Amino acid sequence: PSELDRALKYETGYAGRSWFLKDMQDNQLGNQIASSIVTAYSDPTMEGYGSFSYDHEGTPARRAYILRDGVLEEFLNNRQTAAIMGVEPNGSARSTEAQLVPLIRMTNTIFAPGQQDPQSIIADVEDGYYIAGHRTPSIAESRENFRITAVKVYEIKKGQLGRLYRDGGITSDSRDYFMSIDAVGN
């Protein structure tokens, strides 16, 4: 939901909207929308697939912090939507073909590493599940709810991986999910 064309409802029929911005006065910019240990960014300057130096409007590529310490910091934007919000464009306009209008899209989207070793996170779980190998994501039009199916789901009991299940998943309210994160692996 961090693409500003979606948030401004430019492509609701095509790709949905965003709960980050209901309208210009009712938006989540600057608000805590995730746990303070969550930082996420889109970075087209990283080497590899999804990398570029300039977007398809000629804007220099740069890292765009979507969430920093759980606070919604910026939307991915293009020149038009950046002007509407009164901010600088962040190089997120891309097109699959030269004759098509560039759309605002994520590049290399990263959740920044946390402080904890993944094994210590599992060891701290009394009763839960470890979900591995996502398969099919599904998200509501407003991006408020989501479902992700997984290849493997391990039961966790008293800090130990246990029974293996196939084809499980998770369904959640996006806001509740992001606010309830209490550990991020390194």
Enumerate the language-model features and the residues they cover.
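N-terminal small-residue-enriched
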Residues: 1-186
